[in-house]
């Protein structure tokens, strides 16, 4: 079975939300938005590990959150980058080598001298045996006896030296540009699958996660979509109406998006060679830079809406008080 990693991107600042705090830390239905998203992947039998990518200024807040409510599958908390694509790459590099294969626990070790006391440390359970981390009564991630680092034990939740500078600002690593590209192949099951999810979609369900993983059995990439119900118009640079697209041919995009790890790495390797590259989602990177890859379209869910405006909280509170499908 492939090893499946969920990357939860929680690095946004929420400028449209109109709050001093990033919206992923907003309370709704008794928990933060981020906690709701983590819980859905934690409860999915398809997911082996979870990584959280967060703005460098909020690393400690996420660590504290996870100490209060441990999630055994969360094995990495990583500093995000300046742009969305930088955050994705930082998250991928926390788990994977540049060829898309899984790092072993020693390779994951972080020796950051800036980490706060009691940073969580543990070897991700089951990496050597291929099994997923298992929940225990007392999670090893936050126990006092694990506060000392050793050569055999990777430091998790450490500041990522590749993604945050000494003053807390972002930096960008383009090392993928120097990696030789192997031929893309989707014939065999991948050793590693990656699901990438926006933290501010807390209504994601276990059934949706399962459908994305099912699509990855026959496709290298899976995108989550919904039909467009409103009429849309296209405008020009001056804001003047120019065209009315056929909405029957349009879809709204959601997350989680799923990938065979080597395919996603190759898409980003090609993208980083483009000086005009900028991504708003990861499937679009594959679509643009790896056009030879067929992308599966998975039906999304209305409950999986993206928290964007304060008014969305009322709708999300309704969904989040209902049992997850």
Where are these regions (language model features)?
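N-terminal glycine-rich phosphate-binding loop and ensuing alpha1 helix
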Residues: 2-62, 75
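Residue-level signal for inorganic ion chemistry
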Residues: 8, 34, 91, 197-198, ...
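Hydrophobic C-terminal alpha-helix "anchor/cap" residues
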Residues: 40-42, 66, 95
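Conserved donor nucleotide-binding strand/loop of the catalytic core
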Residues: 71-82
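Conserved alpha/beta core of the MobA/IspD/sugar-nucleotide pyrophosphorylase nucleotidyltransferase superfamily
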Residues: 82, 251-325
